[in-house]
């Protein structure tokens, strides 16, 4: 179920969490190309105040754990307005151009602080 909330005036931190499933996760050429593209995004994007990039952790199997994704990328923005700017930023668009052909699925979870 999708919950839509009016967050236009949100001023607190905005967390943008992105999960990627690569088409060929065992193909070294593909994983290297994806990692190169996302690392370029991390290095060059001016909007994020913090970043985290990694692979699915190999943890014990539990019903609540989904580690089927190939890569995870999280960016923290100062607010919603900054995240909106990121969506049209040339660094983000270049990443999509360079890497979109490598993934078969992407899921984004965005969150805002309830304390704002």
Positions of predicted regions on the chain:
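Short S/T/G/P-rich N-terminal loop/turn motif that feeds into the first structured element of a domain
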Residues: 1-74, 78-85, 112-116
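A common structural junction motif
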Residues: 39-42, 91-97, 103
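"Short basic amphipathic alpha-helical interaction patches in structured regions
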Residues: 87-89
């Amino acid at each position: 179920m999708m919950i839509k909330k009016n967050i236009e005036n949100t001023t607190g931190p905005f967390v943008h969490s992105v999960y990627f499933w690569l088409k060929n996760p065992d193909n070294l050429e593909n994983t290297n190309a994806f990692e190169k593209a996302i690392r370029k995004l991390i290095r060059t994007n001016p909007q994020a105040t913090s970043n985290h990039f990694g692979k699915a952790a190999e943890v014990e199997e539990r019903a609540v754990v989904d580690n089927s994704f190939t890569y995870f990328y999280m960016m923290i923005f100062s607010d919603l307005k900054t995240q909106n700017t990121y969506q049209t930023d040339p660094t983000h668009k270049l990443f999509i151009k360079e890497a979109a052909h490598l993934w078969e699925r992407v899921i984004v979870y965005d969150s805002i602080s309830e304390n704002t």
